Amino acid sequence: MTPPLPARDDDRPELSLEDKFTVDEGIIHLTGVQALVRLPLVQRRLDLAAGLNTATFISGYPGSPLGGYDLELQRRRKLLEAHHVVHQMGVNEELGATAVMGSQLAMQLPGPRYDGVLGLWYGKANGFDRAMDSLRQANLAGTVRTGGALALVGDDPTAKSSPTPGASEVAAAAIMMPMLYPGDVQEVLDLGQHAVALSRSCGLWVALKMSTTVADGSGSAFVAPGRVQPVMVDIDLDGKPYVHRPSTHMYGARVMEMEHSLVYGRMRAALAYARANDVNRITLRGDNDRIGIVSTGKTYFEMRQTLRELGLDDRELQRLGVRLLQVRMPYPLEGRIVREFAEGLSEILVLEDKRPFVELFVKDELYGLPDRPLVLGKLDENGTWLVPIHAELDTVSIAKLVADRLLKRAAPGELPALQERLERITRPRSLAPLAMSRTPYFCSGCPHNSSVAGVPTGTVVGAGTGCHVLAVFMRPDEVGDILGITAMGNEGAQWIGASPFSSMSHLLQNLGDGTYAHSGSLAIRAAVSAGVNITYKLLYNDHVAMTGAQPAI
């Protein structure tokens, strides 16, 4: 028999699952996605305390690692409504972005109901790419000082639930959208508030890069009303104070004026904000530093954990002359902190996922200095590969990189413990064999079980984005010879380019109902326009379970 629970101490506060969203001060436990839900609630309370009556408009399209964001918003609908938060999911990413752009124009329309509106767009890195035209125009149009606009971008660097690996820094830089990169749940909360203040200060959208481990992960965070106290900056343009007014009048000389304010005013204000608020931080330094390590976002925390596993605490790192720089705003990279960090160093190692990004800005900032350190990143001093440019950095890869640079500078036998720990961390580990191999398959009761199957043997079938892509793992005699997939919404368009050069006369193309509503109907129109022989099989299940589970049609 289960013993009865002890009597409750009436002095203890009542606990609620909504505490993570409503508690003003204390320690809370939440996921990265839940931290994004908390963000507009906190901002509403902060604005009210400052005498501003503001609201929030949220739109976008779900996709991992932000696949559960819309669901979490729906679960907290009453709480959001009480904080004047409106969530309207976009039909697709670009329409959602344009809707959020509209939130910054609302104050210019007759009868504004609020002092300002905070706009939040959300989507995965692939959707960020897809929405580039809309986001470029929205960023150029700008934000209002009492509102602001953020792009919450879900990066899936190892393509765990994406057709391609995701890294959004380059895309953000291409449209001159400042980016902040939180590395854990605490930083999602802190940098989220900074992102709002930055957007309001500089009149630009601000991207918040959410990697898979941060969005899906959970942790404890400390919250308090005064924990983040942004220092707002003013925009100076051509030597005069400048107040940005959002505008979509993008034609003729006017659009050139907007670009001028973007490049010479608003981007400079973003850099000034980074300086004034110490967004990027030198987290460890000593008197005799010779080696510097620069890292961003979640990779910074991976690096710190790896150093501890190597037996390198702060005291030992200082003894070895190691200095650390945490970059939380990779674009635009503020140069003053880079020059301060590099002073006196002989070597800098830049640790970041994917292609060189921060590394290039560091090199550019230091290039003209007479006494500049060697900057290593994707390549070493001999031009050979060093930091991996594919997948993502983890404990093993970081341990090899850091230990190798330290051991090269140490005298023989000076760091035996480091060598021993490195060998232990990087030693291959044998995995227990699985008793049974389980191939991914559709959920029980899902219509895909029958709608994808039953294809005549030898039929060539185009797969598509959605749960039904699992057909690539299934037997050809059940689902046909799978040709492969395209970008979401382009299903079947590959046949337009292939059919003139093949003796095959027909293609069967799978198309999910969610993708059809998102943008797939255009692919059907394209196939009709091209006059190709193709059959579209519209797969209905009313959910997008691999990304968000929102109603498809």
Model-derived regions, located:
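Carboxylate/His-rich catalytic cores and anion/metal-binding grooves
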Residues: 47, 53-60, 447-463
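Short glycine-rich or small-residue beta-strand-to-loop segments that form or flank ligand, phosphate
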Residues: 55-61, 86-90, 118-123, 151-154, ...
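Thiamine diphosphate
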Residues: 64-201, 211, 452-453, 460-546
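Flexible, low-complexity linker and terminal segments
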Residues: 1-39, 43-46, 182-442, 447-448, ...
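N-terminal glycine-rich anion-binding loops that anchor highly charged ligand groups
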Residues: 35-51, 61-74
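Short, aromatic/basic amphipathic alpha-helical patches
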Residues: 71-76, 164-168, 307, 361-366, ...
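Alpha-helix termini
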Residues: 44-52, 77-81, 105-113, 142, ...
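Gly-rich Lys/Arg/Thr-decorated short loops/hinges at beta-loop-alpha junctions or inter-strand turns
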Residues: 13-25, 51-54, 75-83, 114-119, ...
